[in-house]
Amino acid sequence: MAEFNEHDGRGGRERGRGGRDMRRPNRDEQREERRREAARHTGLMKAAFGRETDEAIENARIYEEGEGRALLWGAEAAAAARVAKAAAEMAEADAEGAQAGNEEACEAAEIAEEAAEAAEEAADPDGAAGAAPTATETTVKVVTSFAPEALYRDATGKTMIVDPGAFTRPGGAYEDGAFGPEQILCSESNLYPILVAHKRDFYDKNRDYRRGSLFTDRALYVPEVLFSRGGDVRRADVLVIAEPVRAFALENHRSERECDKALADRIEAIFRIAAANGTETLIVGAFGCGRNGYPVEQVIELIQNWIAEHPGAVPNVVFAVPRMHADAFREAFGAPEPERPAPVVVAEDEGDREGDDEGWRNVELPEGITLR
């Protein structure tokens, strides 16, 4: 946390020759401090929540590209299941009435049965009863805090947090001292060892799907991640899904149309996965905005349209967004942030970019958060 200068009483900093900050640790020291803290925290989580971590690893689910966007829930899923079941019954009747040895009729019946099973799977992907939300409208809240704080302050019921994670590296260099939304999630939970356990089946396979930094909507759904803050332990599901990086994709000769489709597909996948898994509160950031290159208005419009077309599919949505995007989200959703004590904010350093997965200085800090 940035320190207040007690010498001049104005929140300034002591300066040396050339205006150099004499009190601020340099960048390497900051990163090394975070690296040590990451190692300590990971060891603590393994010791305290070993059994729960193993269960989360076992129960995690990978949604292949396009699978999340095809999920159904509630009345939509029930209707699809009824149609598929009726088709299966008709095909079975036709097969029974066909002559013996009519392989074509038998094959049609088998296909229809498979369709019915697929519809049931889409309706309830993990076999969890009562997964369909019952709300008829979606309530939206906009906050300028990181996702873990939003979990403690603003979430109700079964909660899913969106981790805009690194596509090919578990935790996005968390263990090396990187800093960003994903690393913050890892630093307050047992998420990191879960991600590492899925390196081979999720992250390594993602290397074939980078697509000029647009990536895909291939996602890792982790149920019941444990968050710990001051002895208060909370559970939340975490969806690891990469943000498309429009800025780099255009440099890699991807078209505007490809960039727009990637963002729309990603948001569709996020909300459908949340709804199909019975999420009551979805916590998501300004997905795709900032240095990823998408205008905040474009992101907001896609989310607004989805919510309008599926009211109540996700009963509560909390946007945990940086200050620079907060006004746009509040204006769009009419959701003022609850009043909280005004923090003392110290100006941030300008930093360079270290790459897609570990550029911790890319982070647009929420209100009241500063770096040391």
Place the predicted regions along the sequence by residue.
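Macrodomain-like recognition of ADP-ribose-binding/processing modules
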Residues: 2-372
